[in-house]
Amino acid sequence: SAVSYLYYADRIYQINLAIAGIAVGTVSLPILSQAFKEKNLKKISNIQSKSIKLCLLLSIPASLGLIIGSEEIVNALFGYGSFTIKDVNMTAKALEFFGYGIPAFALIKILSNFFFARNNTKTPFYISLLIVVLNISISLIFFKKIGFIIIPIATSLSTWVGVFLYAILLINKKFLHLDKSLFNNIFKIVLMSILMSFILIFALNIFEHFLDFSSKFKAVYLMLIVCFVASFYLISCYLIGLLKTKSFKIN
């Protein structure tokens, strides 16, 4: 059923969100709060820039991975027993559209911290409320025409709207202090993520037969592909200077 499709898709993308957004946000908030108390502008800029960089470093490739390999992922994890090919395809569609919102979901966790660190809880509350209202409104308006798939579409779309609202407010209030190098790093992350995507597409095509619905060891082959592609991405990021030891020290 549609509820099951959304449930299984949600379980998969929540794992990516926990790593890309929640983990970075949890670590950065207390350090950022302390920096604001000290009024240390250089430290604030450093923490904000590194938080966004780490968030995008993890969320952009995760997003592309879910979009490109949604069917193979769902098939490998749940394509057994009473879970039919139709169930795999429907769940994969939901996962794909959730995938488009992964960077936004992660960024929301980071950008809201920039307000929380200043003891401003009202702005994140109102933006969260707006996201929920927009999400529900889009889902209700288009549900009859599009079906259950509008729910992940609305979720991703409304979250991106929230990100843009955060960005506008942070810029207008001059709460955003970013290093100039951040934009260069974002360009590198996008470039490496696109390159990783081509490698992933190539690998999925090569092992297409082994990832078939009837294959007994499809989960093993998918795990090998994920490990290979992830290793390629991380090594590439290290070689171009994105993965330095100091990059993980948010202070």
Can you annotate each of these PLM segments?
Residues 1-251:
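Membrane-embedded alpha-helical bundles of multi-pass transporters/translocases
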